[in-house]
């Protein structure tokens, strides 16, 4: 008998296949006393080393299949394995308590996990999840238990799991794994983000799928609506095969738009750009018809290594992206480290709230030579294409002036040394701090463009961490207050003859696109896989009508009213 579950649609598409259950292994053990303490310490160190090797291989595969930016998550796990502040106490516990390695590992990590989970800071709570993932891996090697390896799947299946760790998701082979469904998770969870990168259907947060599915059961995953059907009837299979076929035809229609400009029904052109993390991501931008790179996150050049990238290394990376876009615009964001992004070789102060602390441009000003090195590399790369530079986390006009003056100083030095540098580099800022949005009219007199980073702008405006489930209901992209800030920024730029882009998740959201078009946004920068879908939508919209829609939305009281307004319009 068919059973239907409802979850959260995390990645578009339909999958119909037999279930592959990713079951947690039995990692139970007995606490024992050891007599040969040194041998026990060596056994623990051996398990650590095997785990490091294994994780390094997983990271390499993730970088190859998903891109360097998605592989960065494993750097956090490797940092845990290499952290003497964690491994040291475990070894001390073995020596002092004469206990087996399994017990020392469990008890010591329990202490750290409890400490991190009790913190208000979401970033620190995520470190607890990293420790749990690493502990499971090390414990499995101590016990000689094999952790299920999704990379070994060699037949068409849908993966069913309570949750998928980043390690699990990075090993999924797209040729065989047609989709996945989990008990827990949300649209912004790691597993959901990975699913969209892999471009496979996914439904998360069903609460009970693992209790409802047995190995080899036929399962339908509807990543469009968030439905899951176990033991579907022939009629249901036929129905979803039709939806799957229609969706494939829809994607084929979108593919026809690859080489077209993005023009609304009434002839208004906007630019659809892509967010990237490495030069390897360019292939996806080009294959999806990206008109520009709206955000190049340079921090990924600094991650996954044990020292700062040299000027030459940076120059080669920037040159590859700028030249690879063949004259199309490339907006490069200078180093945005701090908050949720750390470097193992850069000591940062411990802060109660790192998202409001020493990060991004603030960190660059305090480490000026680091900043100057990056700017020199960017200036040298500018002659190979259409390079634009923007500074993150700008709160005051003086901060922009300081960053601009450092760049102009480096430009003058390079020219004096005979190095060719473009004279047409546009300089802009990220609008992610409400203070910058409110003062956009003054910034617009000095910058060449704005790029609205909605992920942080929404968090800072609503005072709500979007990864904190207790307050995530306040993370509201459609709240009229957010829309008013966006309009304020766009209007300020246009008054000075400048342009505004958006590089947060909101830019590719199909509910937000009509509103943003009506607000006058010039550039929409999103994940490459969302470009063609968004282009298709915009080509069906009349921009003059969207202006009226946006005006009406600005005068609503709640986010729910705005969504209802857009849905009512798009349904007509």
Curated annotation (Swiss-Prot):
Could you give one GO CC term from the UniProt record? cytoplasm
Could you state one GO biological process linked to this protein?
phosphoenolpyruvate-dependent sugar phosphotransferase system
Q: Would I find Cytoplasm among this entry's keywords?
A: yes
Q: What cofactor is this protein dependent on? A: Mg(2+)
Q: Does the keyword Kinase apply?
A: yes
One matching Pfam family, short form?
PEP-utilizers_C
What general EC class does the enzyme of this chain belong to? transferase
NCBIfam families tied to this protein: PTS_I_fam
Q: Which family does it belong to?
A: Belongs to the PEP-utilizing enzyme family.
Tell me the protein's name: Phosphoenolpyruvate-protein phosphotransferase
Species source reads Listeria monocytogenes serovar 1/2a (strain ATCC BAA-679 / EGD-e)
């Amino acid at each position: 008998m068919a059973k239907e579950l409802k979850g959260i649609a995390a990645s578009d598409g339909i999958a119909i296949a037999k279930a592959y259950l990713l079951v947690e292994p039995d990692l139970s053990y007995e606490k024992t006393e050891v007599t040969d303490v040194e041998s026990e310490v060596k056994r623990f160190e051996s398990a650590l080393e095997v785990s490091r090797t294994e994780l390094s291989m997983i990271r390499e595969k993730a970088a190859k299949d998903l891109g360097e930016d998605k592989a960065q998550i494993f750097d956090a796990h490797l940092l845990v394995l290499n952290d003497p502040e964690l491994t040291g106490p475990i070894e001390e516990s073995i020596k002092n308590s004469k206990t087996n390695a399994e017990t020392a590992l469990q008890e010591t990590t329990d202490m750290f996990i409890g400490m991190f989970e009790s913190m208000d800071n979401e970033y620190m709570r995520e470190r607890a999840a990293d420790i749990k993932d690493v502990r499971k891996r090390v414990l499995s090697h101590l016990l000689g238990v094999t952790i299920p390896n999704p990379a070994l799947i060699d037949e068409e299946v849908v993966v069913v799991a309570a949750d998928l760790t980043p390690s699990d998701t990075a090993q999924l082979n797209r040729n065989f794994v047609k989709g996945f469904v989990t008990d827990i998770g949300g649209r912004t969870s790691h597993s959901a983000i990975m699913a969209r990168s892999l471009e496979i259907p996914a439904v998360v947060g069903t609460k009970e799928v693992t209790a409802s599915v047995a190995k080899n059961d036929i399962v339908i995953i509807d990543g469009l609506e968030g439905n899951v059907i176990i033991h579907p009837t022939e009629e249901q299979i036929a129905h979803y095969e039709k939806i799957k076929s229609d969706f494939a035809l829809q994607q084929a229609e979108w593919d026809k738009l690859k080489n077209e400009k993005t023009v609304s029904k009434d002839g208004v052109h906007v630019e659809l750009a892509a967010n990237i993390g490495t030069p390897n991501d360019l292939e996806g931008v080009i294959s999806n018809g990206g008109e520009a790179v709206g955000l190049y996150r340079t921090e990924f050049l600094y991650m996954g290594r044990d020292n700062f990238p040299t000027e030459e290394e940076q120059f080669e990376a920037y040159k590859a992206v700028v030249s690879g876009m063949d004259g199309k615009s490339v907006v490069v964001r200078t180093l945005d480290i701090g908050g949720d992004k750390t470097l193992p070789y850069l000591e940062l102060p411990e802060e109660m709230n790192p998202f409001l602390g020493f990060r991004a441009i603030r960190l660059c000003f305090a480490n000026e030579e680091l900043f100057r090195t990056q700017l020199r590399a960017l200036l040298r790369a500018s002659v190979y294409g259409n390079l634009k530079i923007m500074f993150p986390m700008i709160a005051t006009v003086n901060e922009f002036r300081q960053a601009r003056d450092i760049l102009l100083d480096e430009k003058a030095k390079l020219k004096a040394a005979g190095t060719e540098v473009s004279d047409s580099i546009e300089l802009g800022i990220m609008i992610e701090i409400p203070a910058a949005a409110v003062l956009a009219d003054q910034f617009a007199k000095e910058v060449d463009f704005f790029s609205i980073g909605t992920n942080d702008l929404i968090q800072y405006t609503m005072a709500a961490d979007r990864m904190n489930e207790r307050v995530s209901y306040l993370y509201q992209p459609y709240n009229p207050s957010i829309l008013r800030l966006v309009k304020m920024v766009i209007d300020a730029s246009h008054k000075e003859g400048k342009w505004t882009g958006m590089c947060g998740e909101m830019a590719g959201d199909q509910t937000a696109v009509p509103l943003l078009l009506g607000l006058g946004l010039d550039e929409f920068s999103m994940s490459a896989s969302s470009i063609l879908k968004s282009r298709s939508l915009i080509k069906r919209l009349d921009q003059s009508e969207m202006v009226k829609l946006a005006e009406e939305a600005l005068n609503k009281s709640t986010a729910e009213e705005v969504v209802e307004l857009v849905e009512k319009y798009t349904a007509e």
